[in-house]
Structure formats: structure tokens, C-alpha cells
Amino acid sequence: MLPFEFEFNTTSSPECDVCLDPQKLFVKLFKRTIVLLSGPTGSGKTDVSLALAPMIDGEIVSVDSMQVYQGMDIGTAKVSLKARQEIPHHLIDIRHVQEPFNVVDFYYEAIQACQNILSRNKVPILVGGSGFYFHAFLSGPPKGPAADPQIREQLEAIAEEHGVSALYEDLLLKDPEYAQTITKNDKNKIIRGLEIIQLTGKKVSDHEWDIVPKASREYCCRAWFLSPETEFLKNNIQMRCEAMLQEGLLEEVRGLLNQGIRENPSAFKAIGYREWIEFLDNGEKLEEYEETKRKFVSNSWHYTKKQKTWFKRYSIFRELPTLGLSSDAIAQKIAKDYLLYS
């Protein structure tokens, strides 16, 4: 219910549906509107965001767990420095590769960035492919029990004896929803998930979240999920991986090893890095190059399927088919929607 009464003009033109909908009018008067843009890896999120920002006077907030790290540029498809100079970007290059960065850190950094952008009468545009991070932004940071050294030691022993895949299979049985959102090689997240289940008797996906100001309450969130045609996306992933190698991904990985990426399990296991770290560790054998590249492409493709699964859970994200549309055309659709609510 609105806290006041209005007489609504029901003869307004179809374009002005804000005039006909009390909820939309309430949002328009009392909430600031922000834009959330996601989509699978290789769907063109970056190009769309760069086209969209000037249309709505926006600044971009990265929703990516690896783009926060300095030096992880090519493998994360980080937006160019030139583009960042033209359009302000937030949450990029804010950590050294050895420093930890988790979903709680992201939540508070992202909220702070949005407040800063809005204080200057600009529009926050959150862009990325991490469903877990978007969920934290909308719902608040996760609240879980403290780590239990004994349980962790037991789980580490299982991983040592039977491999991380055994732990992942266990997590898949106990909490398939959460397991689908992480990679089967991410030992830290797998162990943390099993630890929470063992300590609380509840699935991670069912766990309570901290009672803090939530973006979904504070702002009117207009959220979009880019949905390219499957064959197009597959081809794009292949070309993207090839381009990264041509741009110097292997040299980037060598540099990160020198900077201590092994000290950061999350960064060390990131797709596009773990495959080539293994290749370098095995002596850079020429006969293993093509197989490593195949794994790189395959892992990237499988991750896109996890992303789609995650975002299907959230009705706030509206699917936007992109077949036959340029980045500008997609941006115009989103800008038109934003202007209706702002």
C-alpha cells in the first residue's frame, strides 16, 4: 500500500505504465534505481555495459571474484585501461594476488561503491557473471558458523587420500544447489560447504543471511541476464580462449606465479589460470599444449552452464535473448527500461 492516496489517470498512453501502476509510482518516488547486468561467460556483458553507461550516465561496478586482483587481466577478460579511463569502473584491481577476497568483502565494497556513485547523481551498473556475488548483493552477506579445525582436518585428509572430486561428489549429494554454483576443483569452497552442513545440519543454499541493509530493499534493482543462442556462445568461448592465448595469457600466468598466486587458493584455481599453471608445472611440453587448451575451453563452457543454472533461480533477472542484436541495441533496450523506472 502507498502511504498516501492518488487518483490515477487510467487514460494515459500505453507507454506511461508508471502512471497506471501504484507500485511503479512508489518505486519512482522513493527508491533510487540501479541496473544489474549478468549473463554467461562470453555473452558480451562488457560491450553492452560500455554502450549502456553513457546512455544513462552510469558507472560500472564489477561483480567478478577475480577481476579484483591486480595482474589477472587477460584470463579474466578485464576491461581495458582505456575504457576504464573513459567510464569509471569500481572493484577492479583492488587486491594484490596474494590477498584473500571473499563474498563478504565483495558485499561491503559493492554497497560502498553504489553509495558513492549515487551520491554524485550517477547510476550504478553492476556487471558480472557471479551468481553467488549477485545473491550476496541483493540479500546481504552470508552468515555461517566459525571454522572448525577438526572437521577441516578430516575433510583435508579425505581430499589428500581420495582427491577433491570425492568431496565434491559428497557435496553434490548433500547440497546440489550450492554444488552447482562452484567448480569441482575449488577445494576451499567445497570444504567450507561440507563444514557448514556438518556443523549446522542445514544446506548452504538454505542458510540464513545476515540481517543488514539489503540492496533489494534499498534500491529498485532492474536486473537483466543476457541469453545468447547456444551455438553462438560455444563458438564465442572457443574464440575467446584462443584470443586470450594470442594476447599473452601464458606470460601473464608466469608473472602471477612470480607474484605468489599459489598463496591464494581461489585465484590459483580460477579457470584460465589453473589449466596453464599445471601446464607450466609439467615442463611446458609441446605435446600437452593442445590438450591443455582443450581443457581450458571445456572448463569455460561448463562454467557457462553453471551460470545459467544459478540465474534461473532468480526471477528478478529477466532473460534477454541477444540473437541478432548488437551491443548498442541491447543497451538501448536496458536504457529504455531504466528510464521508465528512474
From Swiss-Prot:
InterPro entries: Dimethylallyltransferase, IPT, P-loop_NTPase. One of its GO terms (molecular function) is ATP binding. It catalyses: adenosine(37) in tRNA + dimethylallyl diphosphate = N(6)-dimethylallyladenosine(37) in tRNA + diphosphate. Its EC number is 2.5.1.75. The record marks S130, R152 as: Interaction with substrate tRNA. Substrate binds at T41, G42, S43, G44, K45, T46. Belongs to the IPP transferase family. This is tRNA dimethylallyltransferase. The gene is miaA.
